[in-house]
Amino acid sequence: MLRLPRITRRALSSGALAPHFDRPLPPPPPAPPAPLCALPPLTAPDALAPLTRRTVRHADALVARIAAAPAHPDPAELRRVVKNLDRLSDVLCGVIDMCELVRNVHPDPHWVAAAEKTYETLCSFMNQLNTSTGLYDALVATVSHTFPGNPLSPAELRVAQTFLSDFERSGIQLPPGVRAKFVRHSDNILSLGRTFLSFAAAGPSADTPIEIPEPEVLLAGLSSKFVASLPRKKRKGPALLAPGSWEAQMIGRYADNEEARRLVYIGSMREDKDRVYVLETMLKERAELAHVLGKETWADVALSDKMAKTPQNVLQFLTSLATHHRPSAAADVAALQRLKALSTVSRTSSQLPTVHAWDRDHYAEQYAASLLPNGSLPSITPYFSVGTAMSGLSHMLSRLYGISFKPVSVAHGEVWHPSVRRLDVMDEHGKRIGVIYCDLFSRPGKPSAGAAHYTVRCSRRVDDDPSEGDGLPPGWDQHLGKGMEVQGEALHGKEGKYQLPIVVLTTDFGTVEESGPALLGWNDLETLFHEMGHAIHSMIGQTEFHNVSGTRCATDFVELPSILMEHFISSPAVLSTFATHYTTNEPLPIPLIQAHLQLDQSLKALETHSQILMALLDQKYHSIKHGEQLDSTRVWNELQSQVGVIPPVRGTAWQTQFGHLYGYGATYYSYLFDRAIAGKIWSSLFARGRTGPAAANHDPAAAEDILSREGGEAFKEKVLKWGGGRDPWEMVGDVIGGAEGEQVAKGDEKAMELVGRWMIK
């Protein structure tokens, strides 16, 4: 059994890591600008156009080489097809993924515009390659060949199968004219999806302000100063609010008058016909694309290579969860109803009043206060500066996986804003294994779409690239500038040299001032640990092949490492190892941790049921068939009436703010699915009997058991290191072990049922 020295606070001293995040950084010394993210081609916005041309030229050469491989006289060239396809994917994705970051986070509109253009060009180019019969035929010939004495490895076969699935999902076996339809529909979906996401990120339309008549009366419960600060139509006229604004949120949460809350809710969720049209057109385009591919629905297409496999399996999983959770969610609503009854002075009926959507936040706030002896809790934010949390993360990861964070100063021009910090991820041998850029702090104009993890570059082995056979003449790129290729670095325990991963985490955690650090609330802390779970998957999942590296795995598996990280941060024993007051250095009192964790669990059934509803909505929207009409608002209202515990609100169209409908189309269930698996792994590997009161034990032995290297190594070796290079069902079965592990490893309907039971437990 692997054991590390007993945890002490001295061992967890923050060193240089906490100041790296908790103090303003001095500007880098004057020097010629470095390229963005230290990637040589990214010197200026106008460098993206030649990089795009270079990328297409290199990709064209690789396509020609791969397509010619079956007719090549040397069988070794056919043997290289999987490697060369992976190189082709890396050449394109290395630029596309970088542009995805730039167009979402860069404050310079010139960079954003250039990235948008490159992104569109290369995504369209990639969609065309997905229908290339030359590439597909070469891959089929490769996997059909025996290659005596040098067969394809399991990793190569996994990568090949991933590419074959991509081709077949793109209708590769269809006639040429039909394949052209695939490209057209895919381009339409890409364009509509981007528009839909921009609407969702922007929040409710502000074209028509919310009007609150007689604000002095309707806004009782809010301070007179707040009410007086609201703009008016005229001196004694109604107060005007921007939908979704901070002021609107304050009224929705704290106004005692139900009519005020109702006006704000409807105004913030009102139906915008243009936005509804974009969503419904995108969903219909997906249904049309499914029809082109010979599938009934987009859900059939999207789930064919996921763990769940079919829409029927997903619906069974979600329906069983909804049936199980609905009584508990209804009990949560009943608690809110009782609070509403107490505040409804004129009520004459003995029946409890209905809790509407505009009541939920208001009475949830009151319910939380009712659980506390004095109506409130001392804040925990002073114990969680960003630097303290990062130090705790680094030490936790060191104990579990043998990796840690090293703060690194950035060069002038390396990052898109001075507040961005760089971390090098180090192994136990002092070797860098990757880079994380942390864009964690608020700034004017920063996109407010929430936290995100961007993979700028995936890992892959590069020293065995057969680039001499690409058919490109010497100096072919001289007029196009540098590419994204690297020489690679040696990694401990791995043969060859690897391209190291680069990831970016973005959040909105306040600002660092000379007067003090940015402090994290509980939700912020969960967000940081969750997003870091994705980053660590990228760092540890360094496979030989780009296409299965790190987070490039099934959508309904990719959230597992991140949700597992949430379990660690919910452990008082783990929190007690690093949470200290940013001014006094006093440890966070354990009773305060426990009280906040208990508060965080209040109304949890209602929140879980809301997630189930959203996942069901995603399935319903993506289960429409070719030619079917769709009224997305009617579908949402019916679902709330049939399965929900809070009635729908007519005249609203919340679904246009559900941005995950694009990125997670038909796979939003993944959060619930991976939560079930993460809970099982947590109890099997890490908690091991420390559930309930035992989990609150905060002596060093409790932390040692939870942060056990034995458990960390098991998860690292059986899950994280594989990225997407192994069947996820087999990974889950391997890490769970025993009879349940054997059953779940089969990945059949019974395995799905078993995961559902884990969630219910």
Swiss-Prot record:
Q: Name one GO molecular function term.
A: metalloendopeptidase activity
Q: What is this protein called?
A: Mitochondrial intermediate peptidase 1
**Pfam families linked:** Peptidase_M3
Membrane spanning residue stretches: none
> Record's CDD domains?
M3A_MIP
The biological processes this protein is annotated with in GO are:
peptide metabolic process; protein processing involved in protein targeting to mitochondrion
Source organism of the structure: Cryptococcus neoformans var. neoformans serotype D (strain B-3501A) (Filobasidiella neoformans)
List of residues binding Zn(2+): H530, H534, H537
